[in-house]
Design a protein with these regions (language model features):
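Nucleotidyltransferase catalytic core that binds NTPs
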Residues: 1-114
């Protein structure tokens, strides 16, 4: 729920964005919402290996196409695990995440006493 709220606030200025949650398969969500394609960002070749397999399964199982976008080089190393670890040890992640996420990470670190 916290992630949903942060994403909603971060994208509030974008009129064509809808933030939603789904507990099943992404292709089932797509079918339920008349979505014909998925756009995924790729950070590295390792992402591509997995995502290509998933795209092929999704296409075969449901007809939903997947398109890939390369991540900007400045962000290609980022992962939620890395950002959380940096924040946990007091690192500055303000240039890596939206302001609201940075504030939430700082609050979580303060609560944990680190």
């Amino acid at each position: 729920q916290e992630r949903m709220e942060m994403i909603t606030k971060t994208t509030a200025h974008l009129p064509n964005i809808r933030v939603d949650s789904w507990s099943g398969l992404l292709v089932d969500y797509c079918k339920s919402n008349d979505i014909q394609s998925i756009v995924k960002g790729l950070r590295a070749v390792t992402d591509f290996d997995y995502e290509l397999q998933m795209a092929q399964v999704n296409l075969q199982a449901s007809g939903v196409e997947t398109m890939f976008m390369a991540t900007a080089p400045a962000h290609s190393f980022l992962s939620s695990s890395l950002v959380k670890e940096l924040a946990h040890y007091g690192g500055d992640v303000s240039s890596m995440v939206p302001k609201i996420v940075n504030e939430a990470l700082k609050a979580r670190v303060a609560e944990s006493g680190n």
